[in-house]
Amino acid sequence: MLKEYRTVKEVVGPLMLVDQVESVSFDELVEIELHNGEKRRGRVLEINKDKALVQLFEGSAGINIKGAKVKFLGKPLELGVSEDMLGRVFDGLGNPKDGGPKIIPDEKRDISGIPINPVARNYPDEFIQTGVSAIDGLNTLVRGQKLPVFSGSGLPHAELAAQIARQAKVLNSDSKFAVVFAAIGTTFEEAQYFIDDFTKTGAIDRAVLFINLANDPAIERIATPRMALTAAEYLAFEKGMHVLVIMTDITNYCEALREVSAARKEVPGRRGYPGYLYTDLSTIYERAGRILGKEGSITQIPILTMPEDDKTHPIPDLTGYITEGQIILSRELYKKGIMPPIDVLPSLSRLKDKGIGKEKTREDHADTMNQLFAAYAQGKQAKELSVILGESALSDTDKLYAKFADAFEGEYVSQGFTTNRTIEETLNLGWKLLTILPKSELKRIRDEYLEKYLNKAEESK
């Protein structure tokens, strides 16, 4: 029989202090019954002697200290998981949001998860095709990797997220592919866009959606990514699926963390965020990966908006330390009408070399990637020079590089949000663009690949 406490001492923001408690443990799930019979949930955030600090998931509005009854349930916050979750939409706490019935779970899992033993990890080395050339060709995503997208306010990261979720697949694999999508603190319009896009394209059949709206309690945002990852771990490591987890927007998650930290009167760190922000983010990002002897995997694409487009802001800064690269969206390219506006030069996938090459993508992938990077960088330099000194100051070769840079942005990077390119199409397009330059300038590509692919590209022009 669970004890019922009527000793609520104080409620401040999303926190409740309960006095005279016994045998309560950290992270324990709490049920609060209000004077009108309404029930809410929370979790134990801190224990000090006979006092417990409870974090409320549904907010504290309407709670009367004298009439509230509190029960400590002796278990952490759990999610009931089953393969029937595929094709369903849930709120940030795992309750059905699509009008469908509740899931009959195969098992219930603690949403905090269990860290993967480093010795049991398998190295990520299998290519994931997203259908986006700027990612597949130049900043390749590898199965088991965590590759964030750094965006800015007003940039089309939602469209890019939906495109990747719709198009992503593992080549040459018999295993099922699933997408777990977590929208954190999103607007109603954006949430509806995701649901409609997934439903219209049929992608929802292989997807699980967790949607936390902007007007939902901020505390729910702290649980949402963990709910999504718990579902992903079950599908990956119990059902052998390749799972792609897309989370947007991590900035909203960090704001919720800051709100709780301020309510607890903790000493703030950089820009008011708690000093443990790095540790907390790592508990989310480090749940990606592959396990030796298991067929499935979890690949993460967390999306965050950089306040004032500042890469040195604590959220992108700390995310960059934990994850394996970043895809950066550019406001300058967006203004030019290039969609998706991926700035390939500062973007980076640290594991791209492991997922490309013969029998993975194609033998010439690494060489063409290096040549495209070098040529685009030189082309941008030539264009900047022409702005300062005038086009007449450029050599004939510089003019070709400037022409290449424009064609690269207009044809390779810009493909819209509905075009799904195979890796073969992406590599062939790269070769086609390289024909703009003289053969003598293609110094980063081996002669055998030049002979094999350059002639084909020139013939197809």
From Swiss-Prot:
Gene3D superfamilies: 3.40.50.12240
GO biological process, one term: proton motive force-driven plasma membrane ATP synthesis
Similarity annotation: Belongs to the ATPase alpha/beta chains family.
PANTHER family found in the cross-reference section: V-TYPE PROTON ATPASE SUBUNIT B
SUPFAM superfamilies to which the protein is assigned, alphabetical: C-terminal domain of alpha and beta subunits of F1 ATP synthase, P-loop containing nucleoside triphosphate hydrolases
Name of the protein in its database record: V-type ATP synthase beta chain
UniProt organism field: Clostridium botulinum (strain 657 / Type Ba4)
GO molecular-function terms, A-Z: ATP binding; proton-transporting ATP synthase activity, rotational mechanism
Reported function: Produces ATP from ADP in the presence of a proton gradient across the membrane. The V-type beta chain is a regulatory subunit.
Disulfide bond entries: none
UniProt keywords, alphabetically: ATP synthesis, Hydrogen ion transport, Ion transport, Transport
